[in-house]
Amino acid sequence: MKHTGGSLPMYMQIAEMLVREVAAGRLIDGEKLAPERDMAADLGIAVGTLRKSLAELQERGLLERVQGSGNYIRAVSDPQSVYAFFRLELIEGGGLPTAEVLDVARLAKPADLPAFGTSTEGHRIRRLRRIAGKPAAIEEIWLDGSYVDTITIENMSESLYLYYRTRLNLWISKAEDRIDLGDVPEWAPEVFGQKAGSSVPRVLRLSQAQDGAVAEVSWTWFDHTVARYVSRIR
C-alpha cells in the first residue's frame, strides 16, 4: 500500500527547504533574501505562508529581519531541523526531502539485522524518498516492537523521527551510519531509478533513543545519479 499522508504543513516544508539550502551553502551567512512578494511568487505560495516560514526561521535564529531593509540569513550550527538526521542531498546540494510509505508491517526481526531492542518483533517500514521531487532513495526501517503495538500509516509523519517524538515519546538522539555497496532489493518501486539487483550505495543506520538503547535499525539504498550522502563536520 502506498501512502503519502502526514505531510508537513506547507510553511514548515518551505522552512525546512531553506534550512537545507543554508546547510548546503547555497544560502550563505549574511545573504539578503529576495523581497517577500517576489520570493513567494518564485516558490508558488501565498505571501502569508512565506511569512510563517520566515517567522519559523527567525525563531530558530536562522533569519534576521531588518526593518526597512529586508531579511538576512544567519547561519547557525544547530538549526533544529526535523530532517537533521537526513544525510542525503541532491548532487547540486540541498533539496526538501519527502517520503512515500510503501508498506508497514509488524514482523519477526530478520536474523541478519544487528541486535537491537528488547522485542523479538519489529515494525518494518518501507519508504520511497524523494528530494525536491526526484526519486532518490528507498528505505527499510525496523523499529523495535516494544515502543508501540501497532503503527497506523495515516498517523505517520513524513519525518519519521518527528512521529516517534510526538506519538511514541521516543527521541532519536544519536545515530551511527555504515556505508557500503548493496544490491537494490526486489521490492523497489519502478519509479526508483535503479533496477532490482543493481549495485548502489547503501547505508546501515543504528539509531539510539534518549536512554542510549538502539531503538531502530534501517537500510537505505540511494541513487548515486541523483543524490549524495553528505556529513558536515562543524
Swiss-Prot record:
Main location: cytoplasm
UniProt keyword list: Cytoplasm, DNA-binding, Transcription, Transcription regulation
CDD domains according to UniProt: WHTH_GntR (cd07377)
Stretches assigned to coiled coil: none
Keyword Zinc: no
One MF annotation (Gene Ontology) recorded for this entry: DNA-binding transcription factor activity
Domain of life where this protein originates: Bacteria
InterPro entries membership: Bact_HTH_transcr_reg (IPR050679), Chorismate_lyase_/UTRA_dom_sf (IPR028978), Tscrpt_reg_HTH_GntR (IPR000524), UTRA (IPR011663), WH-like_DNA-bd_sf (IPR036388), WH_DNA-bd_sf (IPR036390)
GO cellular component, one term: cytoplasm
Description of what induces expression: Induced during growth on sulfoquinovose.
A Pfam family per the record: GntR
Function, as annotated: Probably regulates expression of genes involved in the sulfoquinovose monooxygenase (sulfo-SMO) pathway (smoABCDEFGHI).
Protein name per its UniProtKB record: HTH-type transcriptional regulator SmoD
